[in-house]
Amino acid sequence: MVEAIVSFGVEKLWDRLTQEYEQFQGVEDRIAELKSNLNLLKSFLKDAEAKKNTSQMVRHCVEEIKEIVYDTENMIETFILKEAARKRSGIIRRITKLTCIKVHRWEFASDIGGISKRISKVIQDMHSFGVQQMISDGSQSSHLLQEREREMRQTFSRGYESDFVGLEVNVKKLVGYLVEEDDIQIVSVTGMGGLGKTTLARQVFNHEDVKHQFDRLAWVCVSQEFTRKNVWQMILQNLTSRETKDEILQMEEAELHDELFQLLETSKSLIVFDDIWKEEDWGLINPIFPPKKGWKVLITSRTETIAMHGNRRYVNFKPECLTILESWILFQRIAMPRVDESEFKVDKEMEMMGKQMIKYCGGLPLAVKVLGGLLAAKYTFHDWKRLSENIGCHIVGRTDFSDGNNSSVYHVLSLSFEELPSYLKHCFLYLAHFPEDHNIKVEKLSYCWAAEGILEPRHYHGQTIRDVGESYIEELVRRNMVIAERDVTTLRFEACHLHDMMREVCLLKAKEENFVQIASILPPTANSQYPGTSRRFVSQNPTTLHVSRDINNPKLQSLLIVWENRRKSWKLLGSSFIRLELLRVLDLYKAKFEGRNLPSGIGKLIHLRYLNLDLARVSRLPSSLGNLRLLIYLDINVCTKSLFVPNCLMGMHELRYLRLPFNTSKEIKLGLCNLVNLETLENFSTENSSLEDLRGMVSLRTLTIGLFKHISKETLFASILGMRHLENLSIRTPDGSSKFKRIMEDGIVLDAIHLKQLNLRLYMPKLPDEQHFPSHLTSISLDGCCLVEDPLPILEKLLELKEVRLDFRAFCGKRMVSSDGGFPQLHRLYIWGLAEWEEWIVEEGSMPRLHTLTIWNCQKLKQLPDGLRFIYSIKDLDMDKKWKEILSEGGEEYYKVQHIPSVKFEKDYK
């Protein structure tokens, strides 16, 4: 609902006015009036959100409030920034500008007055058109829809599922938990909407083994808005005789509790709670359960941790989506009429098209059923082809805002969206920026959220922007709205994506809320522009973008280019940006600039917080870049041999992420000592900056250092000594340079107690002993070290290591040995470009958890170790093409890898 999103914006604006109140000397009365009006808006939005009204008039009022909030926020921030700029100017200049200051404040007061008038008009319109009554009416209809849905779920608890496909194994497993596992009392079935959780629970509920095991059975659908008393009444009615129904309805809550507690204590009962939404809902219900073990509970929910806290006798079961084959079987039952009992009537061409369409369902049973229903009454190839052309919208089934189809994919999945807190609604809608199947990087996403004010200050508590953003992703994953897995080495969510059906809902919601304007194809003519009033604009895979011609919204706050072609760049034209002074996010990944220069007009974007020029084709940055004092994210790792960077970064005190160019002229000097809030600093070079500048950066989590002139190890380690939060350290030197070989003789700084990832690209013929490495190291990468001795006997004693990379000439010897008991946690091993390596011995008992093994471009290695046969955990093996003949089925070494599910031969370095 847009009300929740706008309400979030009003709250942020209110907080800003409160925090910056001392800045508004001379206009205090106007600010007080504005805060009073904001209070009125907050009350209205709170009411509209709580009652979930969907009328067009209410939406119109809310949209107008949203525009007012955006404009007010921009106006206030512009005033504060200009005031700060004046304070930084010299005394003489200040004296000469006193008159200008008075004029500026008068203009600001006038602007506030204009905003207040707009608020008053919205409030007047709400009274004139009876908006408050519409909200109340909408609340009643929303409640009726919820009640109807609850009744449907309750009615079908004992129904037979004619379209039950692919769940037999799951039913057996769940029945086992309930019937055979005495130590398990609570079983939850969790997953995204439409996955078939309720269908699965029905099969378990009606299973003969379950009926035989339990004396009493109860099925209770828990609506989103329920009372504890009502739920307890339904449980008692289910568990007792029908004659007591009226008596139960007369009971008070305390009496219900006592009756249920005693009943569950003295009988073997199973209670199914279908569709619990919140952990606190379960907390309200569960006081009726006694400590004794006779009872069991089966829960269905979209939230994975619904009954987890404080309960050791709990197991969560997460069904997987249907396979393509299972989806096809389910689809046939619904879409294709039978010729006889064993055969479906279907044209071969239609079958091929049907199989293509079900792929779009992503294995979601509800989506497959909806698709089957849509095609059941369509009998020609032409009908099927026409539907396939816009399959996403057809399956999701979104109509207008008053859509009452409770079984549509849109309705089922959008319930999860409506249940989100306001800030997470923003986060979810932001994912509409990205194309289908795009791997969304969580770190960059977190900084975009922070730049737009979506990350709430109350969630920081000393955490980094990345930490807070990741906690939001974790919450969306827990609610089964986003798909992401933690990286085994970092234990972080590195990337995420959406299920195809959830993405369709995300796009539709974003369109409803006018959240972002998505451009996949540029306007066909030079005179056409992208219409629309959204404050966010994303262009997906453009070949050319002419900013001043193609974008006509001066209130734009976010401009993102999502570019997925790794080999080519796209052209950026008309890039003065002067008309887009309110931008907060600007992502120009792989842009090719006119004249290879970043325009000086970039300095006018004083609101900018996020600027990404990663792999852009630009040779020179303007000194006006220093005006961007609100930047928290700056990536200038451009795709040119040498980038001119003016010494203008010192004033960017808010920077949290700075990625410098990999190659910069040694004449360029950059002062960085003021950037004490940095959390990530990449491509720092001793050729362009002083190691002394690092000493104040105590908040760094990630640091990449390039050593290009003689530096003692004492000087280097003294610079990073105070970085007690450092997790990821990379050190590189010029290729083959031996003057830094003593840097690592005694190992890395032991004071770096949180260091988890270490990347060394330097000449280092001897590896330090294992005691000279941080004890919690999970990942190490060695590149160009020219190690003479086998590194594995040392590395395998680092007990927390989960990833090892040996890159080009990391080891120059001939023989490596992996010992029994070595690398107990290792998950991934990458070996590339070891030109002299001939033999690898793997003892039985080595690397017991290895999942991925990659060996490329090791020309002298003639055979894989026999010990690979004993590593049963390996799932992926990736080799050069030259190995294909001997490792494929029938090959002389196939017996060593036949237990590995995925063996690939992708590269050839001959």
UniProtKB/Swiss-Prot annotation:
One of its GO terms (biological process) is response to other organism. SUPFAM superfamilies: L domain-like, P-loop containing nucleoside triphosphate hydrolases. Keywords: ATP-binding, Coiled coil, Leucine-rich repeat, Nucleotide-binding, Plant defense, Repeat. ATP binds at G191, M192, G193, G194, L195, G196, K197, T198. The keyword Coiled coil applies. Residues 15-57 form a coiled coil. It holds the Pfam family LRR_14. Residues 148-460 form the NB-ARC domain. LRR repeats lie at residues 580-604, 605-628. GO terms for molecular function: ADP binding; ATP binding. Belongs to the disease resistance NB-LRR family. PANTHER family: DISEASE RESISTANCE PROTEIN RP, DISEASE RESISTANCE RPP8-LIKE PROTEIN 3-RELATED. The LRR repeats probably act as specificity determinant of pathogen recognition. Potential disease resistance protein. This is Putative disease resistance protein At1g58400. The lineage of its organism: Eukaryota, Viridiplantae, Streptophyta, Embryophyta, Tracheophyta.
